[in-house]
Amino acid sequence: EALHTGDMTQAAALLGRPYRISGHVVHGRKLGRELGFRTLNLRFRHSKPAATGIFVVQVHGLGEHAIAGVASLGVRPSLDADDVNGGRVLLETHCLDWPQPMADALTGGEAYGKIIAVDLLHKLHDERKYDGLDALIAGIKQDCQDARAHLATHANNAFNAPHTQTQRPTTLDRI
């Protein structure tokens, strides 16, 4: 229920950690790059996540420390109004301050296939349908400003802690 309503604080309290989505970075349409907002894209093959919307996030797996970002989790109503995405849910994450090695890796295509984990910290709003690319760009800029403002008032020590790869429990761990 907390995830469905976007109460990420309650969801984190119930889970004992922020709600996390992980997967392999996949190729997108490269439109984010053209608009000035490079993204790391994760697709959902079979299931739809419990939460959708625009979120303040932290990204793990790009370096030693987590990186702040803003992410869209949903079906992209402004870009896929005619359902060219087949109704599939995407997680498109824009890091607010790309580390230079990762910016270079994205340009060179080295990020594709890399496994990342994205923690959803705070929901900014539901998905919105914008009238054209200029309105979409303005909306993304505002989301980035709102994410920075949220992060400035909600200090999170996870950005300073080294990233550790979490492992799935094995059968022996559950016995």
Where are these regions (language model features)?
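Anionic-ligand-binding alpha/beta catalytic cores of soluble enzymes and soluble regulatory domains
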Residues: 1-40
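Phosphate/ribose-recognition catalytic cores of enzymes acting on nucleotide-derived substrates
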Residues: 28-175
